[in-house]
């Protein structure tokens, strides 16, 4: 019956062919062009989809099956492609391909061909499935749909067995969900910052070029010659891409390009790479981060911020900003009423003296300049020192096609308080100068008379005032603002009339700003001849850099058009930008006017600091602090003429030619101003004249040379070029409003800017994510080339092909430049096609590079995306102890590197041994409508879907059953003499009559077929093969050594002073049966930490009393409460009474403040302990460990991080106060387990004895052993019973381990895993019996400096130090086990288990080093997955009456008979049968219980008199199944504990190394019931959990079958340890008793522990500063 069961269980394997021989041909390129071979492979596969061809080792391999070669189906590639030449050809039997090194032929070509064959088969399968639309190619595998726009990663690997079977393994990557790009646009179900992008088909991760808004990166119909890219995508994926598709501007992640994963703790981050590509938006997949909303209420933050002085200042500044904005609006309205003459204002700059207001309008598609807040493309996330709240206003994304007037009107109607969130920017970086004006100044501004300088005519004045009004409170204007109006204005549109009118207005004297950052002072000179600063070593401050407003980075000026209209500003001036512009050219500089300027000095220096800077202040960060100084400044004294021309602040870095002749030309063009403000001249003359504004800044040397040449050209051509240029010689190639002759068409978005940034500021977790986007926002189609480029500027947009483009090194200028090689290609191609620029092949790696999908995390959180450096919470009594609790504002998971080792020591046990209450993996915090997509999606990729998809493309495909893996083909191939003599019977008898297994196998082997060539012979052979296989499955029997049930696990307990062996179900009745631990009792002190509000402290006292009483009744020991008093001299210390530390928390108080208060109380506790020691009051028991029991009411994921920080600080304080004798252990329990909270009232739940006993068991396990003999091992309350020896070992006999291991051998299991971002390392140790259990984690780095090693004392370690530490711990644990067993003759085996991967080389080299050094320890290397797979079966469930979880054995006997076990395994030989039958159980008094086993088997209602049906003599109740009959021979057993072992006879590859066969593979199987559907279906199919174990290496004296069976038996024991170690959920107390906990029921505890802890640690960001 076992065979019948195995023949119905499905596997992940699907058979595609049965082969006899394979012919292969190796081709090389005639002209040694390896890249041509690579491209030729794609062409061949596209032309013949079913062909088996691949490029490998600089050759092209072509394979043909032997049975197809006779059919003339081979293709002569040399005739089709003359550039190919044949290198080698051969035909080999199929049994030589899987193991070419063991073949008789000593042929190197065969070794390469065997690897190439699997690659060619995999590519062919994936390509055909993609061609059919079933899957999408993704990385080294593919993705398959599981719902509407939801995909899961499907790993497809072909395998060739030695018997000729070609099968394909199809396994879903668990817990990884990807979404279609249509979810973000056009469906707009989530905001723009909570996802990462992966390319199809390569799987490379990319970043948005403009991270502030997805829509700024989308382009429709770009003017590029993208045919080559689309054609390459078509022949690679089989998917036709339309040229009119939507394109997106992306930056590839170079780290992921090298198969490395970014830090998961801050997975959405900035990148230093400044190269971008254009990619079809349809060929992108999104992975959304999990967002955890902040639990604080609105009033909560307001209350907490009042305690911070900086917040008080911020509130005050916000008030001043709003007040000054109102005054400014009143002044503007007055100016509009008195509007008279038209006065033109410069297009190039805002007010020089205004700090907040500027002359730039709110134009469509605004992309704020990140540099204005000190962020740059290379600025890492942790360097953002300020929590900038104003993401919505600071990075505003307006509609592209909205009219300017509509935008202005919309801006006017917006609430004025929108600018209040700009506090940090304005105040920390210069802000609005009106903030610094006092009331007198404001009154003076209101009383001033309007002059022609203040007014414009008609629509221009309205627009100008509105634009000024819109940005009066915003310190960061957009780059696109300048570009847009540069398109609007013709080049000669600046009026001269503004200059003489400036005398009519004299600005008021303003007092210095108290928060005036260096931004203004370093780039804008208030007084040319400054007497305050004289430094002979510095360049002379004769020429300021007064191009733009102090709040506008000069990159914004250089890349964006100026606004139009008047610029009243807080410090009014007629045309301040024009004034300084002409001063710079010495055309209208007047000392009298200059003397009118107020002298403002920086708050940081009493003198004015006026260096000559190459660009604005932010450039110094991008260029490494390079301050531009002319090379001839030290030798040539004539600096006026050399430096009169404005320096390089434009994108191109070109100097702007300007001369005195500008005056006349500007006067002549005064009348043009009105018409130029419209958008009708978008394709104006300025575009045509800006061809030379581009330069290549690929490296610093070229950049400096270009700057020298530009200076010379600027000096020579000042006069001649002025008429052809705008006042600023800008790169006016605007991507927001393109020239009319260009076909560049961004996505037509009509939403307002507020809708574009819909929910960015609504979530706490996204307050600062906009700064992470690296290259600058909204520069979609611009890059620079050298001035001698032959391209016109309107043609440059067409050159944005899907290749790498490099941006400028200047971080405020978002121009992009191609690499040198790319530039040469562009120049060459431009000669051939002046209208379009052909593509480069630089994007080939983005298509052909297959990224390993294992580098993609299953999930990542958005918690840490605010900033790693937040405003600290200052208090008057700030502790000297370094504390990182204040760097957390909301729900960030950030910890400092200092004392990280202690932090992890507290974190590990609280995460792992959590009573199953951790729900991090079960919580999906997706944003907005993504949750709806998940609800409509399937839980995974079903086997039926896989079979249907394969069958549509490859009709001759069928799923393999488990029994096919259990065939011993070697035994079937052996023929004895009797079989050879009776061969004539095969000819006499019919096929149906003779069904011997060997004869059937011979017939099976003779049939050759495949699913790739659809001819009649293949179909006929396939049908015959299936019929023979069905007969063979029915005829062949399975050995019990290959398919068996693992024995029951029993535990050791103490009952009345005697050791009793009991199955683990008896542990659930620990208190009822008065059991005791085998080890000695553990006593400790307890300190319960809880929050209180009003009168809610009673629950803590009640729970503490209950747990102390239960712990004692369970015979675990005694718990004493901590009571500490203070002394009169330390009245600041609060005494501790009754073991309680109650921290008051108001409902509007943040948990961060609560944690800080708790931390202070525990630090005070340390001082109380020290006072108790000094005063010798002996209230504190130093001989007992101290338990810190924390009741956690915070449901956020970061609560464990924060609480463990408190524990770490307490431990560090004990060391600081020289109290090493205090041994502490901790426990964090969620409040949901203990209390019920309704509104503001908190009450203790009613506990069952079972729940309290589980908590007591957990505390006993965690309590350290005797303090006198400290050890890393902590005794458990019970251990597993060791299996009795199967045979007697005689040591004087030379017996080997091939058949069995010695009873004295010591096995220690070590499971470990390293996170995919290589930042965390977790290991756990366990022996099979639970005598030693240990877990440890490390923060890992590939390279650790000597200073870090000495400073952080092992807080950060490299892989070599970690492996040494692991080996040292393993050696210590072997010593403990050796002392426990008292054996000296056995060997030591370390079962090294690598989770989720084979051992990589960087780890393998250290394990080899350590194992060769320590010969006494023998390594057994195993590879496993963290999670099991779910497989189906053709069997139907027995839909009988539902039974309880724990049923007597008679309920299971049908199952045992089904599996073919002749004798029951659950009968007890210790219990005595009762002859009185059911009459004895009619009342409690008549029930005789002679053993605990009988008590467990008593019915649930045995205490109530009622009639029961007596059991029959056979021991099985005569009642219906499910009735509560009693039989002393029946043992209570949990059905979930039934685990079966399967050892396939066929060698199989590892799940993560498909080309390498394991030494042995084994499967643990457990039947599970799928929930929720059983009530509605009549025919429920059985489902099994399958856990795969791969044996990779061991000593050669082992019998592999015996060793695998031994490992599986030990795994079964360690599965039972999950419950003993309190890792499983408490029944009825957890809301996650779903799929996740059910699936982990078959995983051993040490593997569960590693995965559980690592899944949490990867989301923690470590601050190394």
Curated annotation (Swiss-Prot):
GO terms for biological process: filamentous growth; hyphal growth; positive regulation of single-species biofilm formation on inanimate substrate; positive regulation of transcription by RNA polymerase II; single-species biofilm formation on inanimate substrate. GO terms for cellular component: mediator complex. One of its GO terms (molecular function) is transcription coactivator activity. Transmembrane segments: none annotated. Residues 728-762 have a biased composition (Polar residues). It is found in: Nucleus. The keyword Transmembrane does not apply. Residues 411-460, 482-512, 551-580, 673-781 are annotated as: Disordered. The keyword Nucleotide-binding does not apply. Residues 551-568 have a biased composition (Low complexity). Its main location: nucleus. Keywords: Activator, Nucleus, Repressor, Transcription, Transcription regulation. PANTHER family: MEDIATOR OF RNA POLYMERASE II TRANSCRIPTION SUBUNIT 13. Component of the SRB8-11 complex, which itself associates with the Mediator complex. Component of the SRB8-11 complex. The SRB8-11 complex is a regulatory module of the Mediator complex which is itself involved in regulation of basal and activated RNA polymerase II-dependent transcription. The SRB8-11 complex may be involved in the transcriptional repression of a subset of genes regulated by Mediator. It may inhibit the association of the Mediator complex with RNA polymerase II to form the holoenzyme complex. This is Mediator of RNA polymerase II transcription subunit 13. The gene is SSN2.
């Amino acid at each position: 019956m076992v065979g019948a069961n195995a023949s119905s269980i499905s596997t992940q394997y699907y058979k595609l062919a049965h082969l006899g021989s394979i012919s292969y041909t190796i081709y090389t390129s005639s002209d040694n062009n390896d890249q041509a071979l690579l491209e030729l492979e794609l062409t061949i596969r596209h032309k013949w989809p079913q062909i088996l061809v691949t490029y490998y080792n600089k050759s092209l391999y072509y394979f043909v099956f032997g049975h197809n070669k006779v059919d003339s189906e081979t293709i002569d590639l040399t005739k089709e492609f003359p550039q190919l030449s044949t290198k080698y050809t051969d035909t080999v039997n199929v049994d030589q391909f899987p193991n070419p090194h063991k073949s008789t032929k000593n042929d190197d070509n065969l070794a390469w061909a065997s690897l190439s064959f699997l690659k060619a088969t995999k590519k062919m399968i994936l390509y055909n499935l993609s061609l059919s639309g079933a899957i999408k190619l993704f990385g080294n595998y593919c993705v398959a749909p599981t719902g509407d726009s939801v995909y899961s990663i499907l790993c497809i690997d072909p395998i060739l067995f030695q018997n000729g079977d070609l099968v394909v393994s199809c396994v879903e990557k668990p817990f990884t969900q990807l979404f279609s790009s249509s979810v973000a646009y056009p469906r707009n179900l989530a905001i723009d910052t909570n996802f990462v992008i992966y390319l199809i088909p390569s799987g490379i991760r990319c970043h948005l070029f403009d991270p502030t808004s997805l829509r700024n990166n989308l382009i429709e119909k770009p003017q590029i010659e993208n045919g080559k890219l689309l054609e390459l995508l078509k022949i690679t994926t089989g998917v036709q891409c339309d040229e009119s598709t939507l394109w997106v501007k992306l930056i590839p992640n170079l780290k992921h390009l090298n198969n490395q994963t970014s830090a998961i703790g801050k997975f959405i981050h900035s990148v230093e790479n400044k190269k971008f590509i254009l990619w079809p938006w349809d060929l992108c997949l999104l992975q959304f981060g999990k967002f955890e909303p902040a639990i604080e209420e609105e009033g909560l933050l307001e209350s907490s911020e009042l305690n911070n002085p900086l917040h008080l200042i911020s509130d005050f500044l916000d008030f001043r900003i709003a007040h000054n904005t109102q005054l400014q609006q009143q002044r503007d309205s007055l100016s509009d009423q008195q509007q008279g003459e038209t006065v033109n204002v410069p297009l190039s700059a805002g007010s020089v003296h205004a700090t907040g207001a500027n002359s730039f309008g709110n134009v469509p598609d605004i992309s704020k300049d990140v540099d204005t807040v000190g962020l740059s493309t290379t600025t890492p996330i942790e360097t953002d020192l300020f929590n900038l709240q104003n993401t919505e206003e600071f990075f505003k994304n307006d509609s592209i096609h909205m009219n300017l007037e509509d935008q202005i009107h919309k801006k006017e109607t917006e609430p004025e308080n929108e600018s209040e969130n700009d506090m940090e920017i304005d105040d920390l970086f210069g802000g609005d100068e009106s903030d610094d004006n006092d009331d007198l100044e404001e009154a003076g501004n209101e009383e001033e008379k309007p002059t022609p300088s203040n007014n414009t005519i008609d629509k221009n004045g309205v627009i100008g005032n509105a634009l000024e009004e819109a940005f009066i409170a915003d310190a960061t204007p957009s780059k696109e603002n300048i570009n847009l109006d540069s398109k609007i204005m013709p080049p000669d549109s600046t009026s001269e009339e503004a200059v003489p009118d400036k005398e009519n207005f004299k600005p008021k004297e303003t007092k210095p700003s108290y928060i005036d950052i260096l931004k203004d002072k370093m780039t804008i000179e208030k007084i040319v001849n400054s007497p305050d600063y004289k430094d002979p070593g510095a360049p002379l401050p004769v020429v300021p850099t007064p191009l733009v407003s102090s709040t506008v980075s000069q990159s914004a000026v250089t890349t964006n058009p100026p606004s139009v209209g008047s610029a009243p500003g807080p410090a009014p001036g007629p045309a301040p930008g024009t004034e300084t512009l002409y001063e710079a050219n010495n055309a209208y500089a007047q000392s009298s006017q200059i003397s009118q300027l107020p002298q403002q000095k920086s708050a940081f220096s009493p003198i004015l600091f006026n260096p000559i800077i190459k660009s604005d202040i932010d450039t110094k960060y991008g260029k490494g602090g390079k301050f531009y100084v002319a090379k001839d400044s030290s030798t040539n004294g004539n600096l006026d003429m050399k430096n009169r021309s404005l320096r390089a602040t434009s994108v191109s870095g070109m100097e702007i030619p300007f001369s005195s002749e500008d005056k006349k030309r500007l006067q002549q063009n005064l009348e043009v101003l009105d018409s130029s403000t419209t958008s009708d001249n978008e394709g104006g003359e300025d575009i045509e004249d800006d061809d030379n504004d581009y330069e290549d800044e690929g490296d610093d040397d070229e950049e400096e040379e270009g700057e020298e040449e530009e200076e010379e050209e600027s000096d020579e051509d000042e006069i001649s070029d002025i008429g052809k240029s705008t006042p600023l010689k800008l790169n006016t190639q605007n991507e927001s409003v393109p020239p009319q002759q260009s076909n560049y068409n961004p996505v037509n978005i009509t939403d307002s800017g507020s809708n574009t940034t819909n929910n960015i500021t609504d979530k706490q977790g996204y307050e600062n994510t906009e700064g992470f986007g690296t290259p600058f926002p909204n520069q979609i189609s611009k890059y620079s080339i050298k001035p001698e480029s032959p391209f016109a500027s309107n043609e440059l947009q067409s050159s944005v092909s899907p290749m790498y483009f490099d941006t400028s090194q200047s971080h405020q200028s978002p121009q992009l430049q191609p690499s040198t090689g790319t530039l040469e290609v562009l120049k060459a191609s431009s000669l051939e096609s002046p209208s379009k620029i052909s593509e480069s092949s630089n994007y080939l790696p983005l298509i052909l590079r297959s990224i390993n999908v294992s580098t993609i995390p299953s999930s990542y959180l958005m918690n840490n995306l605010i900033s790693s450096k937040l405003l600290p919470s200052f208090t008057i009594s700030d502790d000297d102890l370094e504390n990182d609790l204040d760097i957390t504002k909301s729900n960030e998971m950030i910890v400092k590197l200092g004392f990280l080792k202690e932090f992890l020591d507290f974190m590990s046990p609280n995460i792992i041994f959590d009573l199953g209450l951790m729900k991090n993996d079960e919580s999906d915090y997706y944003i907005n409508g993504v949750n709806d997509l998940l609800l409509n999606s399937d839980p995974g990729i079903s086997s039926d879907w896989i079979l249907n998809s394969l069958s549509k493309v490859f009709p001759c495909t069928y799923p393999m059953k488990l029994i096919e893996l259990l065939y011993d083909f070697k035994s079937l191939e052996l023929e004895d003499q009797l079989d050879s003599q009776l061969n004539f019977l095969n000819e006499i008898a019919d096929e149906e009559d003779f069904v011997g297994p060997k004869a059937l196998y011979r017939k099976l082997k003779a049939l050759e077929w495949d699913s790739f060539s659809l001819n009649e012979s293949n179909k006929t052979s396939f049908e015959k093969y299936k019929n023979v296989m069905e007969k063979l499955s029915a005829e062949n029997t399975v050995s019990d050594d290959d398919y068996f049930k693992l024995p029951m696990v029993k535990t050791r307990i103490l009952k009345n002073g005697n050791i009793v062996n009991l199955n683990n179900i008896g542990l659930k009745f620990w208190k009822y049966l008065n059991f005791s631990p085998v080890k000695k009792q553990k006593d400790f002190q307890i300190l319960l930490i809880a929050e209180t509000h009003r009168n809610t402290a009673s629950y803590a006292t009640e729970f503490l009393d209950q747990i102390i009483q239960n712990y004692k009744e369970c015979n675990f020991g005694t718990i004493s409460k901590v009571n500490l008093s203070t002394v009169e001299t330390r009245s600041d210390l609060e005494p501790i009474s009754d073991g309680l530390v109650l921290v008051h928390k108001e409902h509007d108080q943040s948990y961060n403040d609560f944690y800080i208060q708790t931390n202070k109380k525990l630090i005070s506790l340390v001082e109380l302990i020290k006072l108790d020691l000094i005063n010798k009051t002996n209230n504190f028991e130093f001989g007992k460990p101290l338990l810190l029991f924390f009741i956690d009411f915070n449901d956020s994921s970061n609560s464990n991080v924060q609480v463990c920080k408190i524990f770490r600080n307490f431990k560090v304080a004990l060391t600081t106060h020289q109290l090493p004798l205090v041994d502490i252990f901790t426990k964090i329990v969620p409040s949901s387990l203990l209390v019920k909270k309704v509104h503001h009232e908190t009450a203790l739940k009613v506990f069952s004895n079972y729940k309290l006993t589980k908590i007591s068991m957990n505390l006993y396990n965690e309590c350290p052993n005797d303090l006198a003999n400290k050890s890393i091992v902590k005794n458990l309350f019970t251990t597993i019973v060791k299996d009795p020896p199967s045979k007697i070992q005689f040591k004087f006999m030379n017996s080997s381990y091939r058949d069995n291991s010695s009873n004295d051998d010591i096995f220690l299991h070590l499971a470990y895993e390293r996170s995919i971002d290589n930042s965390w390392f977790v290991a756990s140790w366990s022996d099979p019996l639970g005598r030693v259990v240990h877990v440890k984690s490390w923060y890992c780095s590939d390279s650790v400096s000597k200073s870090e090693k000495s400073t952080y004392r092992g807080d950060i370690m490299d892989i070599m130090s970690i492996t040494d530490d692991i080996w040292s711990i393993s050696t210590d644990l072997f010593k403990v086990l050796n002392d426990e067993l008292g054996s000296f003759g056995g060997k030591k085996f370390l079962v090294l288990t690598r989770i989720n991967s084979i051992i990589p080389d960087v780890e393998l080299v250290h394990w080899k080093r350590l194992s060769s050094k320590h010969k006494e320890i023998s390594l057994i290397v195993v590879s496993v997955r963290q999670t099991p797979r779910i497989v189906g079966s053709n069997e139907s469930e027995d839909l009988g009456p539902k039974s309880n979880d724990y049923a007597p054995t008679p309920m299971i006997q049908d199952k045992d008979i089904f599996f073919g076990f002749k004798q029951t395994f659950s009968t007890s030989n210790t219990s005595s049968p009762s002859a009185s039958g059911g009459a004895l159980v009619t009342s409690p008094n008549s029930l005789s219980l002679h053993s605990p086993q009988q008590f467990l088997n008593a019915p649930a209602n045995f205490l109530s008199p009622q009639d029961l049906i007596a059991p029959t003599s056979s021991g099985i109740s005569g009642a219906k199944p499910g009735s509560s009959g009693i039989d002393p021979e029946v043992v209570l057993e949990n059905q979930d504990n039934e685990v079966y072992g399967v050892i396939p006879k066929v060698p199989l590859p590892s799940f993560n190394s498909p080309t390498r066969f394991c030494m042995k593979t084994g499967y643990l199987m457990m039947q599970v019931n799928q929930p929720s559907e059983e009530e509605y279906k009549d025919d429920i199919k059985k489902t099994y959990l399958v856990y795969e174990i791969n044996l990779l290496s061991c000593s050669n004296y082992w019998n592999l079958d015996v060793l695998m069976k031994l490992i599986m038996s030990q795994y079964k024991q360690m599965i039972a340890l999950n419950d003993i170690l309190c890792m499983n959920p408490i029944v009825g107390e957890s809301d996650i008793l779903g799929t996740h906990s059910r699936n982990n029921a078959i995983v051993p505890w040490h593997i569960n522990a590693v995965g559980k802890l690592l899944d949490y640690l990867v989301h923690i960001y470590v601050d190394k500063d």
